[in-house]
């Protein structure tokens, strides 16, 4: 059985910023936690329940991933979760002073910086690295995801945006390690199409969105602070989101994930199927 030592942070770290959808300023605190705690969210502005970062606590997947427990809700967890998962952080208490995690620059960069600032501590207890007993898949309209047994965590993603000539079709495949995530995926920012901005605003979303935390694609070009960080930054960001969403399985696992046009809802659906076939 493949296993490794559990890991947590060496010290508490904080970051303050704005939430992209609700536009509220919030302070995020990451605290070390004991073995077998898992990743747990707490609303520091409420006396509500703790929210384990697990699939049964997924509350909403519209444009971001939201968790809940009782009356406590915490939104847009995926970029932080991707950073924690890719850094092999098993145990941490995440406190947030508002209902949404600060967005930073729209990527996982700020969360990787927080982890670096905190340092990583190896713990005594071990955690098994789970494997898939069989392939699983999820399909809905133009979205397809599959997970195959594999000796490493690999993600192959195809993004197809025929409605956006500036995005078009993009494909990337990575073996996910702390190094590959840090260099190839973590810097990649969230994005939106110019012609969907009004729709999102009408739904009460992206109230904190700006060019400091997102990239906007028009039919004839890109609106961004500076150049794209990669020519295929959108598909890399989709991989980032997928890592964050699948981390809610709650156990480290290895598999080859193949995705075509997936989003938060379908990512979570695949995560539930993966959970059913994990061993040990």
Swiss-Prot record:
Its keywords, alphabetically, are:
Hydrolase, Lipid A biosynthesis, Lipid biosynthesis, Lipid metabolism, Metal-binding, Zinc
Report any one BP term from Gene Ontology: lipid A biosynthetic process
Q: Which residues form the active site?
A: 264
Which metal ions or organic cofactors does this protein require, according to UniProt?
Answer: Zn(2+)
Any one Gene Ontology MF annotation carried by this entry is:
UDP-3-O-acyl-N-acetylglucosamine deacetylase activity
Keyword Hydrolase, does the record have it? Answer: yes
E.C. number(s) listed in UniProt = 3.5.1.108
Pfam families annotated for this entry? LpxC
**Class of this enzyme:** hydrolase
GO CC annotations on file: membrane
Annotated pathway, please?
Glycolipid biosynthesis; lipid IV(A) biosynthesis; lipid IV(A) from (3R)-3-hydroxytetradecanoyl-[acyl-carrier-protein] and UDP-N-acetyl-alpha-D-glucosamine: step 2/6
Q: Which reaction does it catalyse?
A: a UDP-3-O-[(3R)-3-hydroxyacyl]-N-acetyl-alpha-D-glucosamine + H2O = a UDP-3-O-[(3R)-3-hydroxyacyl]-alpha-D-glucosamine + acetate
Residues engaged in binding Zn(2+): 79, 237, 241
HAMAP family, sorted: LpxC
This chain's function reads: Catalyzes the hydrolysis of UDP-3-O-myristoyl-N-acetylglucosamine to form UDP-3-O-myristoylglucosamine and acetate, the committed step in lipid A biosynthesis.
* Family in the record: Belongs to the LpxC family.
Name recorded for this polypeptide: UDP-3-O-acyl-N-acetylglucosamine deacetylase
Question: What gene codes for this chain?
Answer: lpxC
């Amino acid at each position: 059985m493949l296993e490794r030592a559990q890991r947590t942070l060496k010290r508490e770290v904080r970051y303050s910023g704005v939430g992209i959808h609700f536009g509220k300023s919030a302070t995020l605190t990451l605290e070390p936690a004991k073995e077998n705690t898992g990743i747990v969210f707490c609303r520091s502005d409420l006396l509500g329940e703790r929210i384990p970062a697990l699939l049964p606590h997924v509350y909403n997947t519209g444009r971001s991933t939201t968790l809940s427990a009782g009356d406590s809700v915490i939104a847009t967890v995926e970029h932080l979760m991707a950073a924690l998962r890719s850094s092999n952080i098993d145990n941490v208490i995440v406190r947030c002073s508002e209902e949404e995690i600060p967005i930073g620059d729209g990527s996982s960069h700020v969360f990787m910086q927080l982890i670096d600032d905190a340092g990583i501590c190896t713990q005594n207890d071990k955690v098994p690295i789970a494997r898939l007993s069989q392939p699983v898949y999820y399909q809905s309209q133009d979205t397809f995801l599959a997970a195959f047994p594999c000796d490493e965590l690999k993600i192959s993603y195809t993004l197809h945006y025929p409605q956006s000539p500036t995005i078009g079709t993009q494909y990337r495949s990575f073996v996910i390690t702390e190094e590959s995530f840090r260099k190839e995926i973590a810097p990649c920012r969230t994005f939106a199409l110019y012609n969907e901005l009004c729709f999102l605003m009408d739904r009460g979303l992206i109230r904190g969105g700006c060019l400091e935390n997102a990239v906007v694609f028009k039919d004839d070009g890109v609106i961004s602070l500076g150049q794209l960080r990669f020519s295929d930054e959108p598909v890399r960001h989709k991989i980032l989101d997928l890592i964050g969403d699948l981390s809610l399985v709650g156990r480290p696992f290895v598999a080859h994930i193949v995705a075509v046009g997936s989003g938060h809802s379908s990512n979570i659906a695949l995560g539930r199927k993966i959970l059913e076939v994990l061993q040990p």
